[in-house]
Each structure stands twice: as C-alpha cells, then as structure tokens.
Amino acid sequence: MTVSDHPQTVSQPDPESESRPSKTRLKQEMHALQALGERLVELEPARIAELDLPEKLAEALLEARKITSHGARRRHLQFIGKLMRAVDPLPVQEKLDAWQHTGMRHTAWLHQLERWRDRLISDETAVTEFVQTYPHTDVRQLRTLLRNIEKEKLAGKPPHNFRALFQLLRQIIPEIPG
C-alpha cells in the first residue's frame, strides 16, 4: 500500500481552543504577575498602602518580608502571584515605574551637582560659567567656599567646606520635577 492510497486527514481546528490562551501563555502571565509581586514585596509598607491593593494581598506582601526560608518564601511568592490575578496589574506597574523614574531623575540631579562641585574646585574658569548659567548665585559666598576648600586640603582638615559647597549647589540648582 502506498502513501497515495490513504486520504490525507487534515485536522480541523477546534473552535474552543482558539478562544482560550495556550498553557504557555497562561504560565507566562502567571510568572509576570509573580515577578510583579516580588517587586511589591521589596516596597516599604507606606508605598504598599498607596497602591490601594486588596487587603489580603497587602497583608501577604507585608508577611513575605518576614519570611527568611528560601522554600517558604518561594511558595509565598507563588501565593502572592495567585492573589495578583484578582488585581489589574497595569496601574500597579505604572505606579512602580513612576516611582522608579522619579528616583532615577533625583539621582541624575545629584550627579549633576557633584559634577559642578568637582568642576568648580578643579577649574577656575568654571566659576564664571556657573554664574552665567545660574545668575542668582551669590558669587562672593561661592568663591569663599572654594578658597576655604583649598585651605582645608592643604591643612589636611575634614572636608567641611566641601560639603557646604554641595549644600549651596543644592540650593542654587533646581531639581527637575517629575
């Protein structure tokens, strides 16, 4: 008997199977919810309260912080993932991303302050550029701090004026609001 003797059977797609997601997709979604739950566990209790989560989920998140055993923590995170199914993850994810973005913006501002401080100390022409960029600067106070920093370095004293310069820059250079 040859292959051509048998009619080819083409399986008809099951209409029910097309409407429901695959097991793989469901597992991926569950892992994503569990990962989101892990991020929530790392938050401070005040931040968790800001999210308006169901009480049972909020309690589970706070309890997870206390669990030290690896296996118990893993099971508890799976439980949190299960509880997360009842919550719309999009607003929670957006809030977490906004908090993270705010922290990154603040860090960038602090780095900008540090770069200005280092330039002002190492380059005498940076003072003129700084005053042009930030015209409301008290130039006399700035130059006094820079002179005192040099004196502290030569005397081997603690960097009091170094810190004072940073505080002055914090007052002068505005942090970009989010």
Swiss-Prot record:
It is found in: Cytoplasm. It holds the Pfam family DarP. One of its GO terms (cellular component) is cytosol. Keywords: Cytoplasm, Ribosome biogenesis, RNA-binding, rRNA-binding. Residues 1-14 have a biased composition (Polar residues). One of its GO terms (biological process) is assembly of large subunit precursor of preribosome. The keyword rRNA-binding applies. Its main location: cytoplasm. Belongs to the DarP family. PANTHER family: UPF0307 PROTEIN YJGA (PTHR38101:SF1). This is Dual-action ribosomal maturation protein DarP. It comes from Nitrosomonas europaea (strain ATCC 19718 / CIP 103999 / KCTC 2705 / NBRC 14298).
